[in-house]
């Protein structure tokens, strides 16, 4: 079913993007897509004071984390099993804005991002386009990060074998009140809604992953599908539930 959005119909680039992702013009739509400074951005028209949401792998917070974020000592790296001589092939089944996928790719993993919502997929594709063209990170980004648009459940069933790790970060109601999380989560939950079928992701993820499934959860959330993980890596506000199938080597 086509998604209604507002956009400048006089701007050929926007018209092309919306046609590609089957987004239909609606003068009364809550969300607007803009293309400014070679960047696609999403805006909530009900909250005009909020900045637009973009996917940016080249500058800002993700670039800072790539350079100064702790490398393979980060909790997410430990959770997916990154260690010397081991760089897993990962499917990120709930890509969102691609931040976790980018961290893993920057540490050497090959990552396929799966995103079902066409507006979010359009933002991801735009972010990848700019990253692929970047002199500093473009070469390895083209090698290690790709986008698959479709429902996670469908995608996990159809993706080729040879996947070491499936990473899941289902949408969950956030208690965090930080400005960034509030802004992005408000927009995301209005646009996408909660992942009501998230519990159904675990079984196909376990079937696809040859080594392990990693589920990122807020520290107050229950286990996905009520299944107890093999091990848990805790951070300040989140935890990584790890379901191990076989050893990393």
From Swiss-Prot:
Its main location: cytoplasm. Keywords: Cytoplasm, Methyltransferase, rRNA processing, S-adenosyl-L-methionine, Transferase. Its EC number is 2.1.1.242. It catalyses: guanosine(1516) in 16S rRNA + S-adenosyl-L-methionine = N(2)-methylguanosine(1516) in 16S rRNA + S-adenosyl-L-homocysteine + H(+). It is found in: Cytoplasm. Pfam families: SAM_MT. S-adenosyl-L-methionine binds at residues 99-100, 115-116, 151-152, 169. The keyword Cytoplasm applies. GO terms for cellular component: cytoplasm. One of its GO terms (molecular function) is 16S rRNA (guanine(1516)-N(2))-methyltransferase activity. GO terms for biological process: rRNA base methylation. This is Ribosomal RNA small subunit methyltransferase J. It comes from Shewanella oneidensis (strain ATCC 700550 / JCM 31522 / CIP 106686 / LMG 19005 / NCIMB 14063 / MR-1).
């Amino acid at each position: 079913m086509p998604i209604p959005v507002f956009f400048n119909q006089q701007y050929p680039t926007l018209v092309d993007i919306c046609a590609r992702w089957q987004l239909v013009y609606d003068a009364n739509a809550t969300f607007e897509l803009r293309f400014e400074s070679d960047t696609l951005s999403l805006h909530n028209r009900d909250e005009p004071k909020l900045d637009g949401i973009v996917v940016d792998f080249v500058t800002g917070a993700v670039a800072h984390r790539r350079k100064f974020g702790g490398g393979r000592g980060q909790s997410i790296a430990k959770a997916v099993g990154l260690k010397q001589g081991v760089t897993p092939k990962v499917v990120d089944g709930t890509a969102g804005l691609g931040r976790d996928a980018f961290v893993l790719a920057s540490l050497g993993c090959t990552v396929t991002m799966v995103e079902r919502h066409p507006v979010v997929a359009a933002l991801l594709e735009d972010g990848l386009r700019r990253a692929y063209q970047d002199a500093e990170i473009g070469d390895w980004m083209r090698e290690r990060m790709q986008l698959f648009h479709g429902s996670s459940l469908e995608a996990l069933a159809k993706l080729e074998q040879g996947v070491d790790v499936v990473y899941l970060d289902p949408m969950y109601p956030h208690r965090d009140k930080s400005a960034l999380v509030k802004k992005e989560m408000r927009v995301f939950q209005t646009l996408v809604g909660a992942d009501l079928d998230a519990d159904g992701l675990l079984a196909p993820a376990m079937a696809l992953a040859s080594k392990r499934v990693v589920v990122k959860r807020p520290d107050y959330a229950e286990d996905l599908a009520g299944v107890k993980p093999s091990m848990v890596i805790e951070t300040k506000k989140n935890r990584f539930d790890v379901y191990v199938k076989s050893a990393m080597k």
